[in-house]
Amino acid sequence: MARGARYKVPFRRRREGVTNYRKRRKLLLSRKPRLVVRKTNKHLIAQIVIARPHGDETVVGLDTRVLSKFGWKGDENNTSAAYLLGLIVGYKARAKGIKEAILDIGLHRPTPGARVFAVMKGVIDAGVEVPHGEEVVPSEERIRGEHVAEYAKRLKEEAPEAYKARFSRYLQRGLPPEELPSHFEEVKKKIVEYYEQKLAKAVAR
């Protein structure tokens, strides 16, 4: 509630914790496409958005459920899934002629190694330039899920029942969590081969 004559009531979306208008203005002034990354409890969402006179236009928009198309059996909200989502979004952006973008993480804290930066890394590896500092990018080991695999191996040896409970969803999908890094590489290879072929065909036309 306003408390004085000089008190300024924030914009509704800022009050609701949805939009940082100062940051958004800087992004819009750059005149570059925005790589918008958002999180839900179960999935990650990534979009390539272009500001138009009539409003924002989403030219690419996907969430991690798309990974099942390539046989992904891991969780859909972890670092590995975030990277793979970024990889697909990056390839789709290239197919639409987009060569660079600026990361827009909204009100998320820019914590080094966070999943939003794993999405960004995937987009970059697909061939789209995104300005960033190397210190925020998750390590290759973390992107591959090495930390999950190591923890799973240790837990399986020390507490088999706890292992089954902790990784029940992985096991139900037919993926032993200690095999996550190799599974990640298999899915990544499928994505790269699929989209590289599509891009090559588009160029050959």
UniProtKB/Swiss-Prot annotation:
Domain of life, source organism:
Archaea
The GO terms describing molecular function are: 5S rRNA binding; structural constituent of ribosome
Cystine crosslinks: none
Keyword annotations of the record = Ribonucleoprotein, Ribosomal protein, RNA-binding, rRNA-binding
User: What is one term from the GO cellular component aspect held by the record?
Assistant: cytosolic large ribosomal subunit
UniProt record, GO biological process: ribosomal large subunit assembly; translation
Query: What quaternary structure, including any partners, is listed in this protein's UniProt entry?
Result: Part of the 50S ribosomal subunit. Contacts the 5S and 23S rRNAs.
Task of the protein: This is one of the proteins that bind and probably mediate the attachment of the 5S RNA into the large ribosomal subunit, where it forms part of the central protuberance.
Record-given protein name: Large ribosomal subunit protein uL18
Q: Which species is the source of this protein?
A: Pyrobaculum calidifontis (strain DSM 21063 / JCM 11548 / VA1)
